[in-house]
Amino acid sequence: SLDIALKEIKILKNLGIQGIALFPCINKKYKDNIGSESFNPNGLMQKAIKKIKENHNDDILVIADLCNCSYTSHGHCGTIIDGDVDNDLTIETLCKQSIILAESGVDIIAPSDMMDGRTGEIRKELDKNGFHKIPIFPYSVKYASSFYGPFRGAVSNSLNGGDRETHQMSFKNSSEYLREIEQDINAVSNTHLRAHETD
């Protein structure tokens, strides 16, 4: 609950921790094919950010994960068309989600979806809506491997068919990660994250 989260944040602050990262875990009844709950102004993440900022103001830095997998009924990171994730339609949803997060008061947005070109499009959308100062920390390198299982379990995310190999990286490709990081640098991101995913 939000009340428990606020108590936990107070404990973290007393330990000298100055920032937190939020990841959504929502009820199945709010999930659909495109993850529309992600850009609901009254959604869980948005309420959490507002409440944290109301209670802690600028004493705690809030990073929000930006992805659709916790919001989609199928568990994939984007909109499914003809059995596969549609990159461009997914980016549209991510852009909507980024604006709602910004309007809620988030300090940093961290896209973890691995859609091609999403960092630049999110940056354009934020700038267009007056959120020039909100940094983007993309997961530039995210592998389709088995190391991310505990996280997916923690946020109750499971795939309903298929895998993520079409948009996440193969650990067998030792040079692709450099191209991905370069692409995000060119798209004016502010730092880069690397993570391992599971199928």
Please describe what each predicted stretch is.
Residues 71-74, 118, 125-170:
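Conserved anion-binding
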Residues 5, 65, 101, 122, ...:
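Conserved, mostly hydrophobic/aromatic
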Residues 35-64, 119-140:
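Alpha-helix-loop-beta-strand connector modules within alpha/beta enzyme cores
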Residues 45-46, 83-94, 137-141:
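Acidic, His- and aromatic-enriched active-site or binding-groove loops in soluble protein domains
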Residues 191-198:
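Conserved small/polar residues in nucleotide/adenosyl-binding loops
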Residues 1-3, 78-92, 160-178:
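Active-site mouth loops of central-metabolism enzymes
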Residues 26-41, 72-83:
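Surface-exposed, active-site-proximal loop segments in enzymatic domains
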Residues 16-18, 57-60, 106-107, 132-134, ...:
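Short, well-ordered coil/turn segments that N-cap beta-strands
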